[in-house]
A protein has these predicted regions:
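Active-site-proximal loop/helix of nucleotide/amide-processing enzymes and allied scaffolds
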Residues: 2-60
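N-terminal charged helix/coil linker that caps or initiates catalytic domains
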Residues: 50, 55-109, 330-331, 371-372
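Glycine-rich phosphate-binding loop and adjoining beta1-alpha1-beta2 segment
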Residues: 135-175
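A structured beta-alpha segment of the ubiquitous adenosine-cofactor-binding alpha/beta core
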Residues: 164-200, 206-213
Length: 380
């Protein structure tokens, strides 16, 4: 557990000598009662927040950044570096301001799933000059992926290249300064979870409901802004199409969740998790009618993936640099149906009863309070 003391200043953007003395006195007692990292923060009248860690010996270390994950996304780094904007970023600065460009350069963003929507998200984030990308995907490129994974080639499928390797190479070849870390595993890996937990923002580009549920849980435990992407293309079996649609969810810690928004049921999460961890038992229970089958290998096309990926990246930019006429709180869910000519958006719902009690818990044992991750953590 960590304790943060916070108070306000009017027009004084640093800690005072009185703050130094009171923090040393207070946190000497705090450290005696509770292990862990503890700190002190100041909120300015201009709405900015800064802070510092206070050691048990009264030594101060500034917070690298203070992040506020709400309807708007606010990031206040300890040091602002407003250097010259390079030529390749000038259009970004012209569109959203030099301040937004500086924030993008400092962001560490996770992308879980690097196939259809994920590959487009990675490409757009890199071209928007994000500071670092953390990519998670266990799969390799196949022929069936070539029509929807940006930057993939026939030889990548022939060589069975990992999708994360392909994405990392493409980003590095752009030469725009974005760093890339890759994890060729599912999210259900201790190393992948810790890497995503260290991000500021995460994009979920997965089909599996157990992966989406785990990522929503991770974002809750570690206080991350979470953008979830979903696409659906349903054929009618007779050469036509029943439905072409997609959704972008923005989820903030302590708000509603994918589960409470009825994106999936816990029965579906259980079935998907069982299919991943114990396929034989999954097939047996499905055959006996105890669980419903999990949809596999859904159809997808690059134009629908690109549309939904663009909506998601624009949603990030709208929350960093609010440009809409209406408040961001009215855009927790975007739904678009190309088959039915519908675009709609909704505000956040009630806090999720399942996840809200886990907000900000951070590192626990087992990771995310999920028994299946205890073995992973022990092996890591």
């Amino acid at each position: 557990m960590s304790l943060i003391k916070i108070h306000g200043h009017i027009g004084y953007d640093r800690f005072s000598e009185i703050d130094d003395a009171s923090d040393r006195e207070l946190f000497a007692s705090v450290h005696a009662w509770a292990d862990g990292l503890h700190g002190s923060a100041v909120m300015l009248d201009g709405d900015r927040v800064f802070g510092r860690l206070v050691s048990e010996h009264g030594v101060f270390s500034p917070f690298a950044s203070v992040n506020v994950v709400g309807d708007d996304l606010r990031f206040w780094p300890h040091q602002y570096g407003h250097g010259p904007v390079p030529d390749h970023a000038r259009r970004i600065a012209q569109s959203f301001g030099a301040g937004t460009y500086e924030i993008l350069r400092r962001l560490r963003i996770g992308v879980v799933g690097c196939s259809g929507t994920g590959s487009v998200v990675v490409d757009q984030l890199a071209r928007n000059c994000v500071g670092e990308l953390v990519l998670v995907d266990p799969d390799h490129v196949e022929d069936k992926n070539l029509n929807r994974i940006v930057n993939s080639r026939k030889e990548d499928a022939q060589q069975r290249r990992l999708k994360v390797d392909l994405m990392a190479e493409a980003v590095e070849e752009l030469g725009l300064g974005t760093l890339v870390s890759i994890y060729a595993s599912s999210l259900a890996s201790a190393n992948a979870i810790r890497a995503i937990a260290s991000c500021d923002v995460v994009f979920g580009c997965m089909d599996s409901v157990d992966g989406r549920h785990m990522l929503n849980r991770l974002a809750t435990f570690y206080g991350l802004a979470y953008f979830d992407l979903g696409v659906k293309l349903e054929a009618d079996g007779e050469g036509g199409v029943d439905q072409v649609c997609g959704t972008v969810h923005y989820l903030k810690p302590g708000g509603s969740s994918l589960y409470s928004r009825h994106v999936y049921s816990m029965e579906q999460v259980r079935a998907a998790g069982l299919m991943r961890t114990d396929p034989a038992t999954y097939r047996e229970l499905r055959r006996e009618g105890y669980i419903k089958g999990v949809a596999e290998d859904r159809p997808a096309v690059i134009q629908l993936n690109s549309l939904i990926a663009s909506m998601a990246v624009n949603e990030l930019l709208a929350r960093l640099h609010p440009f809409r006429l209406d408040p961001n709180g009215e855009y927790a869910v975007h739904t678009i149906s190309l088959s039915h000519g519908i675009y709609d958006h909704h505000c956040d719902g009630e806090p999720c009863e399942l996840l809200s009690r886990h907000v900000g818990r951070g590192d626990v044992r087992p990771l995310l309070d999920m028994p299946e991750l205890s073995v992973e953590a022990a092996a890591a």
